[in-house]
Amino acid sequence: MKKLLKSVLVFAALSSASSLQALPVGNPAEPSLMIDGILWEGFGGDPCDPCTTWCDAISMRMGYYGDFVFDRVLQTDVNKEFQMGAKPTTATGNAAAPSTCTARENPAYGRHMQDAEMFTNAAYMALNIWDRFDVFCTLGATSGYLKGNSASFNLVGLFGDNENHATVSDSKLVPNMSLDQSVVELYTDTTFAWSAGARAALWECGCATLGASFQYAQSKPKVEELNVLCNAAEFTINKPKGYVGQEFPLDLKAGTDGVTGTKDASIDYHEWQASLALSYRLNMFTPYIGVKWSRASFDADTIRIAQPKSATTVFDVTTLNPTIAGAGDVKASAEGQLGDTMQIVSLQLNKMKSRKSCGIAVGTTIVDADKYAVTVETRLIDERAAHVNAQFRF
């Protein structure tokens, strides 16, 4: 049985090192791996000994914490219906632009994100008790990247309005077309991130250790760059701003310089995780395998961001969208020529959540002189991620 356990854990650890696959699980035996310190010797006394003091029971560890998520499995968390203009169904002419909102099927409902990445570098600090329990925290910085179909972001616009028609200045016009054949991606800045948790070695038998942990992490990065890759409305915004809690129609000045009532786009990230893992020590190597349950949310307050545009008409256009119908001869007297250009385009950053709650982690820890340790881990199923932790005991 011991040989089988050794074989399984070693194979899992070595396999994890050969592929790059939020919150790490960590080695369940970590509280008891480093039993000596670089400044103070470890204490292996009996907790029930009346002569033992808390000074003997407590120790500190510090080190580097790096967590790199290459693909987090996320989906949108939105309502089934979305309020916007009615979908055009007949040849009513360009002047018949909608002015009232109606409930339509939300194209963002249940959408899966194509890619979600997050990279964190932080300092790691742990308070150890009796070489069995760890209370730890991380303080550092994180950055992220999100990519998905434009339907996931409710990319909408008004199609069929006359650019040089008097109604273009009517604030009651609302978008009537949902654009779902394109891609939206965003990059966040590098911002402060923290996490806290606890880990315990619950059961030990020889060189095997069964342990559990619980962690919570939080960060709120701002959106550094937003790219909309769409043939009808393609644009890029650096440090985008938008409207929070604003229903259609948007302000006519939305997307222009000097507009008021907007705020910076930021994403409030929260995640909790509980895990159970089993390890087996083989001299200086301690491979482990574990399962985890986690829930992550990314909330941007459903901020709505408008396409950049000119505040005044220049050459009979306010946006530089490519035409759809191909009408390239724009004349002031030819009303409707610009009706084949998408107008008042905007998107919103919808709330996202974990699509899968359960995952597995495999890794190994290398311990040197019972004072230093390096852990390498990879996580699969609910995310593809790699984790590195290097620490020492005082």
Swiss-Prot record:
Q: Which species does this protein come from? A: Chlamydia trachomatis serovar L2 (strain ATCC VR-902B / DSM 19102 / 434/Bu)
Its assembly, as annotated, is: Part of a disulfide cross-linked outer membrane complex (COMC) composed of the major outer membrane porin (MOMP), the small cysteine-rich protein (OmcA) and the large cysteine-rich periplasmic protein (OmcB).
| Subcellular location(s) of the protein | Cell outer membrane
Query: Could you tell me the membrane topology recorded for this protein?
Result: Multi-pass membrane protein
- The protein's name is Major outer membrane porin
Out of the domains of life, which is the source? Bacteria
Q: Which GO terms describe its cellular component?
A: cell outer membrane; pore complex
- Chain's gene name: ompA
**Pfam families the UniProt entry points to:** Chlam_OMP
GO BP annotations, alphabetical order: monoatomic ion transport; regulation of cell shape
Q: Which residues form the signal peptide?
A: 1-22
Q: What does this protein do?
A: In elementary bodies (EBs, the infectious stage, which is able to survive outside the host cell) provides the structural integrity of the outer envelope through disulfide cross-links with the small cysteine-rich protein and the large cysteine-rich periplasmic protein. It has been described in publications as the Sarkosyl-insoluble COMC (Chlamydia outer membrane complex), and serves as the functional equivalent of peptidoglycan.
A Gene Ontology molecular-function term? structural molecule activity
| Keyword GTP-binding in annotation | no
Q: Which family does it belong to?
A: Belongs to the chlamydial porin (CP) (TC 1.B.2) family.
Q: What is its main location?
A: membrane
Q: Keyword set for this entry?
A: Cell outer membrane, Cell shape, Disulfide bond, Ion transport, Membrane, Porin, Signal, Transmembrane, Transmembrane beta strand, Transport
